[in-house]
Amino acid sequence: MESNNGEVFMGIDKNEWGFRVGHLPHGERNKISDVPGVTVGHCTLADGDIQTGVTALLPHPGDVFHDKVLAACHVINGFGKTTGLVQIDELGTLETPILFTNTLSVGTVETALVKYMLERNPDICETTGSVNPVVCECNDSGLNDIRGLHVTEAHVAAGRGMRCHGLKGGIGSASRLVELDGKSYTIGALVLSNHATFDDLIVAGTPIHELLEARIPPHEDKG
């Protein structure tokens, strides 16, 4: 598999794909980190049947608890186990980094995030209220020994064991530059992809699965 900023993927030149996603220009790296202050970190566990990890997204380099950022959430999959969404929906703010991991490691990662916030904010639950940790998840049991609970509090890449459309899934990112009322803005996105079947792989109306059928056999989707 080869990728060079989208020029070549699975041995297919970008011109063969026959599509372009959107019309807006992207940022310098075409990643969410093009948004000023936003950073992303990964810790990958890759050892035999252990194929998992944790990804952390920090909205800015300062104290997120005291310098909260505006936030919103929208749930389209009633099977998710993300923590912290109720308060985001109620207050419209984010006060911790956002962490991503596998489904059965949400509790461990949430505890690690709480400890991280308490260490940096001794006023939490003393002179202020509690903290709202946000941990997102996907089921990586198709490629990972998820029952082994291998993620510990010391592990701070969630996408290692994910599959998407029967292919290798995981963490992906992009950015777009927009002009609004004479001002320039950078919009970033980070996804943890783990869904769908090979035959459903259609991008911008182009049946990508047909281009790949001769190269990669489809796999059963475990959800």
Segments (PLM) and residue ranges:
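A structural signal for small-residue-enriched, beta-sheet-centric alpha/beta enzyme cores
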Residues: 6-223
